[in-house]
Amino acid sequence: MSHDTNTVDSRTHEGQLNKLGFWIFLTAEFSLFGTLFATLLTLQHGGDYAGKMTTELFELPLVLIMTFALLISSYTCGISIYYMRKEKQNLMMFWMILTVLLGLVFVGFEIYEFAHYVSEGVTPQIGSYWSSFFILLGTHGAHVSLGIGWIICLLIQVATRGLNKYNAPKLFIVSLYWHFLDVVWIFIFTAVYMIGMVYSG
């Protein structure tokens, strides 16, 4: 890629405005997930499981697969941004496509997990804990799906227009968003699955 007006540069005025808007958005996201976590942990401590113990329902091998898929996707996303900074478009796209595929694996297993719980009679309607459980995980899953769609749109832009100073900052921003979702999942894994099994065990 030539070093002219198409050079990757995240310091454009538009890029700076996009970053500012993203940090404002991320602050709102922290507040959203913080509220959902606080609600779930309060209900978790109260033991309102409606007779459905998490130790009987949670499948740790499945949760570990989901966790590894999302954590590895964070790594592949980081590699993609590394190659973006090196202006190596094909390698950037390869690693970002891997990120999307791993994200789809995560979402697929989460849908399977929800379907399994519903088949066992566990729905948001049976109790306040399970309602908060489905809302928290469903919100995170929806955000992951949004991130996947966002990445795909940017990859289409890069494929059609090339990597340039306008889409490069957007790729960097979506990578931050993806890492944020990974951090949220680590908290979910710890608070919902690990601590949850202790409280209901």
From Swiss-Prot:
Pfam family, one: COX3
Topological relation to the membrane, as annotated: Multi-pass membrane protein
Keywords attached to this entry: Cell membrane, Membrane, Oxidoreductase, Transmembrane, Transmembrane helix
Domain of life, per lineage: Bacteria
Reactions that this protein is recorded to catalyse: 2 a quinol + O2 = 2 a quinone + 2 H2O
Location, primary (coarse class): membrane
GO biological process: aerobic electron transport chain; ATP synthesis coupled electron transport
InterPro entries (alphabetical): Cyt_c/ubiquinol_Oxase_su3, Cyt_c_oxidase-like_su3, Cyt_c_oxidase_su3-like_sf, Cyt_c_oxidase_su3_a-hlx, QoxC, Ubiquinol_oxase_su3_dom
EC number: 1.10.3.-
Segments passing through the bilayer: 20-40, 62-82, 91-111, 133-153, 172-192
GO molecular function, one term: cytochrome-c oxidase activity
Keyword check for Cell membrane: yes
Gene Ontology CC terms: plasma membrane
Enzyme class name: oxidoreductase
Record's subcellular location: Cell membrane
Family statement drawn from the similarity comment of this UniProt entry: Belongs to the cytochrome c oxidase subunit 3 family.
Record's function text: Catalyzes quinol oxidation with the concomitant reduction of oxygen to water.
NCBIfam families: QoxC (TIGR02897)
Descriptive protein name: Probable quinol oxidase subunit 3
Gene: qoxC
